[in-house]
């Protein structure tokens, strides 16, 4: 069964009224989790600042994106390590749990290994976003928002030709894109709004909402789920994915 995203869902699908589990000691800063992805070779091959700098310098698209937005090339390894043991790991765990709670007919459409690798790499491009923007106290300006949005494509460009398969690359590139194509970056023929992209989008947003960051407090579990339920109403997240998230 192929999952269809572009059909209207408002007033047609009843989302189950689920008793949400109480939040469990979620302080907003995640301790490293020790499992097979904690030492993912996709990270270990990219932790050297000089190597990443050379990869970026040799990639015309990366240099074009940075230059056109007046961003100086500067590899922020500390941010990458923070993400590795925090938001990225949490997104990976959440995505895997969503997958496990899906109906079997939808599970068959997902490559779980690709999904988990994409979750661990989806914000990789933030290594090239200035720290003063990533960790700014307060709201970003319109210009800063545009620079922040570059991270999806920057991550894609950093990872391509480095042994990352096409499915993972596209999930990284389009993790902020929506089924109707109104997200970012601009879609091309490689955009595939499939069930995996929906799982990654939900897991990414849930993790971000639950974390305390420099510009916001952490939401409770119920608050975060309420925000994502609005995305379901607006056709941005598949209802089956939301139901799976709410059950974990």
Question: What positions do the PLM features span?
Answer:
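Histidine- and acidic-residue-rich, metal-dependent catalytic cores
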Residues: 46, 51-248
């Amino acid at each position: 069964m192929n999952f269809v995203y572009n059909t209207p869902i408002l007033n047609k699908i009843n989302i189950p009224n689920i008793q949400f589990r109480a939040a469990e000691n979620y302080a907003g800063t995640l301790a490293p989790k020790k499992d097979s992805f904690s030492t993912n070779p996709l990270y270990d091959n990219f932790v050297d600042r000089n190597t990443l700098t050379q990869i970026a310098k040799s990639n015309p698209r990366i240099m074009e994106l940075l230059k056109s937005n007046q961003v100086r090339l500067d590899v922020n390894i500390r941010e990458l390590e923070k993400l590795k043991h925090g938001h990225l790991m949490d997104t990976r765990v959440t995505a895997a749990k969503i997958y496990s709670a899906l109906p079997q007919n939808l599970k068959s459409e997902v490559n779980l290994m690709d999904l988990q690798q994409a979750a661990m790499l989806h914000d990789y491009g933030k290594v090239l976003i200035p720290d003063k923007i990533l960790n700014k106290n307060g709201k970003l300006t319109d210009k800063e928002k545009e620079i922040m949005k570059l991270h999806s494509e920057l991550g894609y460009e950093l990872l391509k030709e480095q042994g990352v398969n096409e499915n993972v690359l596209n999930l990284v590139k389009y993790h902020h894109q929506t089924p109707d194509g109104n997200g970012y970056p601009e879609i091309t023929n490689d955009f595939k709004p499939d069930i995996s992209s929906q799982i990654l989008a939900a897991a990414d947003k849930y993790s971000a909402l639950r974390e305390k960051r420099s510009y916001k407090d952490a939401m409770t579990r119920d608050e975060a789920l309420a925000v994502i339920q609005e995305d379901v109403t607006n056709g941005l997240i598949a209802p089956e994915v939301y139901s799976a998230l709410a059950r974990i």
